[in-house]
Regions:
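N-terminal leader/linker segments that initiate helical-solenoid repeat arrays
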Residues: 8-37
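Short helix-capping/linker turns of helical repeat alpha-solenoids
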Residues: 23, 30-35, 48-51, 64-66, ...
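Hydrophobic face of amphipathic alpha-helices that form TPR/SEL1-like repeat modules
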Residues: 23-30, 45-46, 57-64, 93-100, ...
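Terminal, low-structured helical/coil segments at or just beyond the last alpha-helical repeat
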Residues: 1, 8-12, 412-442
Length: 442
């Protein structure tokens, strides 16, 4: 999160009592022409006489090494002289020096003291930094209400960062009464000034109707504004809108464009969707190598769907050289994250000894993981292995239960096997198996 730093154009506003002297005007003219040595020569006697504007300039020039050797202690000395006379800009800059430990011993309490003095006079940077310190409990007791107060003061002056942070506080109810409408108001103020983070949040709240009337077109508008500034999250979500035709006319080429912008920045969701689009000839033309490339980028970030799809491509030799070991590796990664498709496919590989050492027990374990998530093929295969005692002790009751579940999920072979298994069971065993299946369904 940002902290303000001092900057010449907007921090210093010389008072009329000091700005009209000829020497002061000559000094500022010299400074503006980058004739720093002359400016120092002219500012110094004015500063010694107590001219706060000249004192501020000397503080600035010593701090930045303009016309003199950089000297933080000397900078702090001149800022203090002006600050003690009530100059808000110097108070703020002295607070900055205590914050960084430049020319003075670092002291957060001293920082707060000087920011408070400047903030009470309306110094925007001091107000923002005070809000940040109260929010983080830095130099003061953590106080979200006080933080919100200072953000509001800075936000009312148009500071975009304060407006965004205050919007977040209203959204979460941190330091203020939670109020989505008020949050949306502050996001609008920041977004209208071009802040990408606020524009992204506006896209989200219009998408979901949080604090505003749900409006998909308005959502897309704000995602576009943020996306045009490089916000990867907004780029992905705008791509999804074009993909589905929500708030915009469906346009797969436009969708792929925005996914690519986000994917190039490392957004795994966009990379996954690009992988699917290249695989399925959607928006960019079918290109299995390109598909595998995008799946890999997302898979390496831990995206389970991409890990499964990359495993599938190695399994089938699509866009990559067929490689069962590599396929099993990616299936395992996806399966470890709970992807039922990957668990089932890896179970098949263990059953058949493809890319791994054949292991019926491991096949059963993997089928079970997928079957418990409702994967019909895994349920059917698990039922069959119970029926023949492969990798498990033969158990017709369990076999019947799993085939029953698979059949209820529309698996034809499981339905056929169910009838065969039932022929070897007593009515009591069938009742038990059916009860177990009902329990699983509920």
């Amino acid at each position: 999160m940002k902290k303000y730093i001092s900057y010449l154009a907007s921090i210093f506003k010389p008072s009329s009592s000091v700005a009209k002297t000829d020497n002061f005007k000559d000094a500022t003219d010299a400074y503006n022409k980058s004739n720093y040595a002359k400016a120092i020569e002219l500012f110094s006697p004015l500063a010694t006489e107590g001219n706060t504007a000249a004192q501020w300039y000397l503080g600035w020039m010593y701090k930045n090494g303009e016309g003199v050797m950089q000297d933080y202690k000397e900078a702090a000395l001149w800022y203090r002289k002006a600050a003690d006379q009530g100059d808000a800009s110097s108070q703020f800059n002295l607070g900055l020096m205590y914050s960084a430990g430049d020319g003075v011993t670092q002291d957060h309490k001293e920082v707060v003291k000087w920011y408070q003095k400047a903030g009470d006079q309306g110094d925007l940077g001091a107000q923002f930094n005070l809000a940040l310190m109260y929010k983080n409990g830095e130099g003061v007791t953590q106080d979200y209400e006080e933080s919100a107060k200072w953000y509001r003061l800075a936000g009312d002056q148009g500071d975009v960062g304060a407006q965004f942070n205050l919007a977040q506080m209203y959204e979460s109810g941190e330091g203020v009464i939670q109020d989505n409408k008020e949050s949306a108001k502050w996001y609008h103020l920041a977004g209208d000034q071009g802040q990408a983070k606020a524009q992204y949040r506006l896209g989200m709240i219009y998408d979901r109707g949080i604090g505003v009337i749900q409006d998909f077109e308005e959502s897309a508008k704000w995602y576009r504004k943020a996306g045009d500034q490089g916000d990867a999250r907004a780029q992905y979500l705008l791509g999804a809108k074009y993909d589905e035709g929500i708030g915009v006319l469906q346009d797969h080429e436009e969708s792929a464009k925005w996914y690519r912008k986000a994917g190039d920045q490392g957004d795994a969701r966009a990379q996954y969707n690009l992988g699917l689009m290249y695989k399925n000839n959607k928006g960019s033309g079918q290109d299995l190598k390109e598909s595998a490339k995008w799946f890999r980028l997302a898979a390496e970030q831990g995206d389970a769907g991409s890990q499964f799809n990359l495993g599938l491509m190695y399994d089938n030799g699509q866009g990559v050289v067929q490689d069962n070991k590599e396929s099993a590796k990616w299936y395992r990664m996806a399966g470890d994250q709970g992807d039922a498709r990957a668990q089932y496919n890896l179970g098949l590989m263990y059953k058949n000894g493809e890319g791994v050492i054949q292991d019926y027990k491991e096949a059963v374990n993997l089928y079970r993981l997928a079957a418990e998530q409702g994967h019909a093929k895994a349920q059917s295969n698990l039922g069959f292995m119970y029926a023949i005692g492969q990798g498990v002790t033969k158990d017709y009751v369990c076999a019947h239960m799993w085939c029953n579940l698979a059949a209820s999920n529309g698996h034809r072979i499981a339905s056929e096997n169910l009838d065969k298994i039932a022929k070897g069971m007593t009515p009591a065993q069938i009742d038990e198996a059916q009860d177990m299946a009902r329990d699983c369904k509920t």
